[in-house]
A protein has these predicted regions:
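A detector for small-residue-rich transmembrane helices and their helix-helix packing motifs
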Residues: 1-178
């Protein structure tokens, strides 16, 4: 995914395309395509770079559970985050960038250990919270040019992914307790 982000930004910058117009446009039927495309599009190289490092680091943390897991988390976060942004963000705006996915990854890593009752995953979540906690909180504060809606719903998508992808052990324990 990161390679695609960089190739698209290079094309946007050098060829002069207007790929950024394919972001999420709230409550516009044409804007629904942005649910799938917006994480790959960035305003400039600075925007892309600020998303690349946490995307790769947290993505690798999720990928420790396998390729299917990281792809599943990514799909859930993109869907929940994109739909939430499309429904709630102000009209006549365009939302682009991978930060919603980054917030989803962080929320997933924070919640996964609790859901699965796994010590290693709990430790990983605590590390994410310690390193990125203030960034996560500040990203939810409404500011000009920042899609706090994308951050919020990306985070919600991460929580949904943690519950939806809970390990069988956790699910079987829950069933036994019921």
């Amino acid at each position: 995914m990161v390679a695609v982000m960089w190739v698209l930004e290079m094309a946007d910058a050098t060829v002069g395309t207007d790929l950024d117009s394919y972001g999420i446009e709230p409550r516009e039927p044409d804007g629904l395509v942005g649910i799938a495309t917006s994480p790959f599009l960035h305003a400039d190289f600075s925007h892309l770079m600020s998303n690349t490092v946490p995307f790769v680091v947290m993505g690798l943390g999720i990928a420790l559970a396998g390729l299917v897991r990281v792809l599943s988390v990514t799909a859930i976060v993109m869907l929940v985050g994109g739909i939430g942004t499309w429904l709630v963000a102000p009209e006549n705006t365009n939302h682009i960038g991978a930060s919603g996915v980054v917030f989803g990854y962080a929320a997933y890593l924070l919640v996964r250990g609790f859901v699965n009752r796994n010590a290693f995953e709990l430790l990983m979540g605590l590390i994410v919270g310690a390193l990125w906690g203030s960034v996560l909180i500040s990203g939810l504060v409404p500011r000009e040019g920042i899609s706090w809606q994308g951050h919020l719903f990306g985070g919600i998508g991460g929580v949904v992914a943690a519950w939806a992808l809970a390990t069988r052990t956790r699910r079987s324990r829950a069933a036994a307790e019921a």
